């Protein structure tokens, strides 16, 4: 159970960093 919670925490941390960078700079990626 501890390993699962640890992975979830890492995923949340990565998502927070991703959104922080995405909102910090304007999206330059064009689809």
Swiss-Prot record:
Found at the monomer-monomer interface of the photosystem II (PS II) dimer, plays a role in assembly and dimerization of PSII. PSII is a light-driven water plastoquinone oxidoreductase, using light energy to abstract electrons from H(2)O, generating a proton gradient subsequently used for ATP formation. It comes from Picosynechococcus sp. (strain ATCC 27264 / PCC 7002 / PR-6). GO terms for cellular component: photosystem II reaction center; plasma membrane-derived thylakoid membrane. GO terms for biological process: photosynthesis. Keywords: Membrane, Photosynthesis, Photosystem II, Thylakoid, Transmembrane, Transmembrane helix. PSII is composed of 1 copy each of membrane proteins PsbA, PsbB, PsbC, PsbD, PsbE, PsbF, PsbH, PsbI, PsbJ, PsbK, PsbL, PsbM, PsbT, PsbX, PsbY, PsbZ, Psb30/Ycf12, peripheral proteins PsbO, CyanoQ (PsbQ), PsbU, PsbV and a large number of cofactors. It forms dimeric complexes. It comes from the Bacteria. The keyword Nucleus does not apply. The chain crosses the membrane at residues 3-23. It is a single-pass membrane protein. This is Photosystem II reaction center protein T. InterPro entries: PSII_PsbT, PSII_PsbT_sf. The keyword Thylakoid applies. Belongs to the PsbT family. It holds the Pfam family PsbT. Its main location: membrane. It is found in: Cellular thylakoid membrane.
């Amino acid at each position: 159970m501890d390993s699962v919670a640890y992975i979830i925490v890492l995923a949340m941390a990565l998502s927070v960093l991703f959104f922080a960078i995405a909102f910090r700079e304007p999206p330059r990626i064009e689809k």
